[in-house]
Regions:
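N-terminal glycine-/charge-rich "phosphate-binding" loop or analogous flexible N-terminal tail
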Residues: 1-44, 171-173
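Short, well-ordered coil/turn residues at beta-beta hairpins
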Residues: 6, 50, 71, 202-206
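Short beta->alpha connector loops at strand-helix junctions that form conserved
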Residues: 29, 71-72, 88-99, 176
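An anion/phosphate-binding loop that grips the pyrophosphate of nucleotide cofactors and donors
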Residues: 44, 62-65, 197-198
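Rossmann-fold NAD(P)-binding glycine/threonine-rich loop
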Residues: 76-86
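Phosphate-binding beta-alpha-beta segment of Rossmann-like dinucleotide-binding domains, i.e.
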Residues: 94-148
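Rossmann-like dinucleotide/phosphate-binding beta-alpha-beta segment
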Residues: 135-206
Length: 206
């Protein structure tokens, strides 16, 4: 069985991507164009990709392809209708980055709310060591506690962010992108209300 990994560099080097026990594996660091895909997968049985265009144009001359595995949750790079017509299965990684995206959301929130750039520069530039006072409040910073955190898109990531925001003492409100959210533990509001009432707003939608 021939396995082709089109975008090895789309995942970190700390993540093992060794499929040799499954078959003959060919690795490419990156694959961008339809022409590159077509040339590299023409003899493949399984293709592992991320953003490489898996379209009819790139798949039509690869008669042996039976499975496309995505290094991601999304699969908008894959022509699903064409794959169905060929009997090619498509697999993705569901919920692979929920915790990390939520973590990064709060890293950004802290960066903004605590004015970390300003105070980091202030200390590293020597201004803090040179001042005669102990504290510096030249640029005000704020707590998350007591603030309203608005969320657009209450899927897996949105719900994880909501739980973390709540643990910091935030009131959580959200707007459903589809209008059909079944989430009941947080207040659902219309878009204008979300914008008017939120101190912090995070988007977790396509």
């Amino acid at each position: 069985m021939k396995i082709v990994v089109l975008e090895r560099n789309s995942v970190g080097t700390d993540i093992p991507v060794d499929y040799s026990e499954l078959g003959e594996v060919t690795y490419y660091e990156n694959t961008v164009t339809i022409e590159e895909v077509a040339e590299r997968i023409k003899d493949a049985d399984i293709v592992v990709a991320n953003k490489a265009p898996m379209r009819e144009e790139s798949l039509k001359d690869a008669p042996n392809v039976k499975l496309i595995c995505e290094f991601a949750t999304g699969f908008d790079n894959v022509d699903i209708a064409y794959c169905k017509s060929r009997g090619i299965r498509v697999a993705n990684v569901v919920d692979y980055s929920t915790a990390m995206v939520a973590q990064h959301t709060f890293a950004l929130a802290f960066y903004v709310s605590q004015k970390l750039r300003h105070y980091d520069d202030y200390v590293k530039g020597g201004a803090y060591a040179a001042q005669s006072r102990f504290s510096n409040f030249d640029v005000p910073f704020t707590e998350l506690d007591g603030k309203t955190w608005g969320i657009i898109g209450m899927g897996n990531i949105g719900r994880r962010v909501a739980r973390i925001a709540e643990s910091f003492g935030c009131k959580v409100i959200f707007h459903s992108v589809t209008g059909h959210s079944k989430v009941t533990e947080y207040e659902q509001v219309d878009f204008d209300t979300l914008l008017a009432e939120s101190d912090y707003l995070s988007l977790h939608c396509p």
